[in-house]
UniProtKB/Swiss-Prot annotation:
<keyword id="KW-0732">Signal</keyword>
<feature type="compositionally biased region" description="Basic and acidic residues">
    <location>
        <begin position="113"/>
        <end position="130"/>
    </location>
</feature>
<dbReference type="InterPro" id="IPR036312">
    <property type="entry name" value="Bifun_inhib/LTP/seed_sf"/>
</dbReference>
<feature type="compositionally biased region" description="Low complexity">
    <location>
        <begin position="84"/>
        <end position="110"/>
    </location>
</feature>
<dbReference type="GO" id="GO:0006869">
    <property type="term" value="P:lipid transport"/>
</dbReference>
<feature type="region of interest" description="Disordered">
    <location>
        <begin position="80"/>
        <end position="130"/>
    </location>
</feature>
<protein>
    <recommendedName>
        <fullName>Protein BLT4</fullName>
    </recommendedName>
</protein>
<dbReference type="Pfam" id="PF00234">
    <property type="entry name" value="Tryp_alpha_amyl"/>
</dbReference>
<feature type="signal peptide">
    <location>
        <begin position="1"/>
        <end position="25"/>
    </location>
</feature>
<dbReference type="InterPro" id="IPR016140">
    <property type="entry name" value="Bifunc_inhib/LTP/seed_store"/>
</dbReference>
<comment type="similarity">
    <text>Belongs to the plant LTP family.</text>
</comment>
<comment type="function">
    <text>Possible dehydrative stress responsive protein. Not shown to have lipid transfer activity.</text>
</comment>
<dbReference type="InterPro" id="IPR000528">
    <property type="entry name" value="Plant_nsLTP"/>
</dbReference>
<dbReference type="GO" id="GO:0008289">
    <property type="term" value="F:lipid binding"/>
</dbReference>
Length: 130
């Protein structure tokens, strides 16, 4: 009887630690970021984003909470070719989708500031970068 009580007391912190790790283990993956509606918006040169675009932007704003999630989101958004960058009303689908951005700076500035959080590294021409 004493052994089972001791075993239970030893297992409770272990299970609690496992639950905390499992809760923190979910990070955004590139597959979770659906940029298709944004690309279609840019190609059609529409003034209003589609419902799919708005829901994707709102979902993305809700999912990117940790620094790692925000960095993954920035990397994904940076991977979109520059030639599809919208102009005019399409330039800010988050605003049109009523999603509040977490920063007031332009996206390019916000992305540059997250790049600075990386550790310095040596570039191909042997200069210290970072």
């Amino acid at each position: 009887m004493a052994r089972t009580a001791a075993t239970k007391l030893a297992l409770v912190p272990l299970v609690a630690a496992m639950l905390l790790v499992a809760a923190d283990a979910h990070h955004l993956r590139p597959g979770e970021l659906c940029l298709g509606p944004l690309r279609r918006l840019r190609k059609r040169q529409r003034h209003q984003p589609s419902a799919g675009c708005c829901s994707g932007v709102k979902r993305l704003a809700g999912l990117a909470r940790s620094t790692a999630d925000k960095q993954a989101t920035c990397r994904c958004l940076k991977s979109v070719p520059a030639r599809t960058t919208p102009a005019g009303p399409q330039a800010s689908p988050p605003g049109a989708a009523s999603a509040s951005p977490t920063r007031s700076a332009p996206v390019s500035t916000a992305l540059r500031s997250t790049d600075r959080t990386r550790a310095p590294h040596i570039s191909s021409d042997r200069r210290l970068v970072g």
